[in-house]
From Swiss-Prot:
GO terms for biological process: symbiont entry into host cell; viral penetration into host nucleus. It comes from Influenza A virus (strain A/Kiev/59/1979 H1N1). One of its GO terms (cellular component) is viral nucleocapsid. This is Nucleoprotein. Encapsidates the negative strand viral RNA, protecting it from nucleases. The encapsidated genomic RNA is termed the ribonucleoprotein (RNP) and serves as template for transcription and replication. The RNP needs to be localized in the host nucleus to start an infectious cycle, but is too large to diffuse through the nuclear pore complex. NP comprises at least 2 nuclear localization signals that are responsible for the active RNP import into the nucleus through cellular importin alpha/beta pathway.
Length: 498
């Protein structure tokens, strides 16, 4: 899949590059990281943050959000045209946390968007550096994927909450470009398409006129992105049907939900990249490390090495467990919300627990939370091994899975069998095999029935010691199969609310 001539690598998507060789890609990704780091250093100076305050992940999130908001042209235009009380469309800001008299204080800051844009461009040699902005969006998206379970969003579009392993990138903004499209899960794409079709059903003019033409081309583009994620001919043929439909309606919604379900067993190709918070890149750049010169990759050892040598802190609420908070952020850093927990435990070198067993809420602190009782602690983001990120769904096989999440979407290219609960998945495929997609549906169901438990994915791939930078000695892990593999197992994670 990944080697097809027409596909561009992540790094090329990430840097809007033409075809580049590996060294050029590493350099352009490094340049992007340098820019984020320089911007972060400058913002810390502007805000007079101490070294410790600058390494606080909550401050990092606020600063990242400010620059994303400053460059959100569509929203900025909307705010200009629809002024709302108490919101200045030209300003952006958020909470900054400072240590005052041995206590954490919250300070709300406000900056001109124009000023933030100037600082960002200056840090990026005068460019808009969209790649760096997208990188931060993907980090926020990965953090959301790890923190929240999108049950309500799934139910609203007629899907099943147990399909949460397909929802990677579901909170990414539309403007996240090719790099954003690459990391979106099958369920996310299906959900976007269903929302679009529903609007068309409810609004007669949605597909008509000058705007309708734009809408239609957006619809077809999204269909093609989703089609490109599927690995079997029958799934792709069904996507062609959905794309070519004259007047998309309930039949297409049915087909899309069918395809989403099928992806629990016949998994789609979804890219994974380790996107770290700006407060990791800042101090590294400040210490004199030259990412552009040294080169950097989001899918290799580099993020692991960087995290081995980084100090990041987080605010901790009174009844939260700092180790659990660390796990949450570690998983987000490696885009691993839907990976098999047994593999994650092996790579991290400490047990990785399901979301429902973690005593921690999200990383962000709401404006009404009491600061008097806030402590802070170091996030443990180091790992025992490293592994190469995958952009394929791996092949498929079967194993006992859980009430909550019934499949995984692999993050790391490491040999194992991929758990999914075949009986639960297949139970959803009763009945409807008539209609124009019947032969494709039958073919897809047959492939799912044939998926074998013993089949191994990523055969021969292993994890590597952190000293093994060239990935010469793969260590193939062995797993205790009696353990639970799903992160959102019978889960009670909070809902994501915009």
């Amino acid at each position: 899949m990944a080697s097809q001539g027409t596909k561009r690598s992540y790094e090329q998507m990430e840097t809007d590059g033409e075809r580049q060789n590996a060294t050029e890609i590493r350099a352009s990704v490094g340049k992007m990281i340098d820019g984020i780091g320089r911007f972060y250093i400058q913002m810390c100076t502007e805000l007079k943050l101490s070294d410790y305050e600058g390494r606080l992940i909550q401050n990092s999130l606020t600063i990242e959000r400010m620059v994303l908001s400053a460059f959100d042209e569509r929203r900025n235009r909307y705010l200009e045209e629809h002024p709302s009380a108490g919101k200045d469309p030209k300003k952006t800001g958020g909470p900054i946390y400072k240590r005052v008299d041995r206590k954490w204080m919250r300070e709300l800051i406000l900056y001109d968007k124009e000023e933030i844009r100037r600082i960002w461009r200056q840090a990026n040699n005068g460019d808009d550096a969209t790649a760096g902005l997208t990188h931060m969006m993907i980090w926020h998206s990965n953090l959301n994927d790890t923190t929240y379970q999108r049950t309500r969003a799934l139910v609203r579009t007629g899907m099943d909450p147990r399909m949460c392993s397909l929802m990677q990138g579901s909170t990414l903004p539309r403007r996240s470009g090719a790099a954003g499209a690459a990391v979106k899960g099958v369920g996310t794409m299906v959900m976007e398409l269903i929302r679009m079709i529903k609007r068309g059903i409810n609004d007669r003019n949605f597909w008509r006129g000058e705007n309708g033409r734009k809408t239609r081309s957006a619809y077809e583009r999204m269909c093609n992105i989703l089609k490109g994620k599927f690995q079997t001919a029958a799934q792709r043929a069904m996507m062609d049907q959905v794309r070519e439909s004259r007047n998309p309606g309930n039949a297409e919604i049915e087909d899309l939900i069918f395809l989403a379900r099928s992806a629990l067993i016949l998994r789609g190709s979804v890219a994974h990249k380790s996107c770290l918070p700006a407060c990791v890149y800042g101090p590294a750049v400040a210490s004199g490390y030259d990412f552009e010169k040294e080169g950097y990759s989001l899918v290799g050892i580099d993020p692991f090495k960087l995290l081995q040598n980084s100090q990041v802190y987080s605010l901790i609420r009174p009844n939260e467990n700092p180790a659990h908070k660390s796990q949450l952020v570690w998983m987000a850093c490696h885009s691993a919300a839907f990976e098999d927990l047994r593999l994650l435990s092996f790579i991290r070198g400490t047990k990785v627990s399901p979301r429902g067993k973690l005593s921690t809420r999200g990383v962000q602190i709401a404006s009404n939370e009491n600061m008097d009782t806030m402590e802070s602690s170091t996030l443990e983001l180091r790992s025992r091994y490293w592994a190469i990120r995958t952009r394929s769904g791996g092949n498929t096989n079967q194993q006992r899975a859980s009430a909550g999440q019934i499949s995984v979407q692999p993050t790391f290219s490491v040999q194992r069998n991929l758990p999914f609960d075949k009986s639960t998945v297949m139970a959803a495929f009763t009945g409807n095999t008539e209609g124009r997609t019947s032969d494709m549906r039958a073919e897809i169901i047959r492939m799912m029935e044939d998926a074998k438990p013993e089949e191994v994915s990523f055969r021969g791939r292993g994890v590597f010691e952190l000293s093994d930078e060239k990935a010469t000695n793969p260590i193939v892990p062995s797993f205790d199969m009696s353990n639970e593999g799903s992160y959102f197992f019978g889960d009670n994670a909070e809902e994501y609310d915009n």
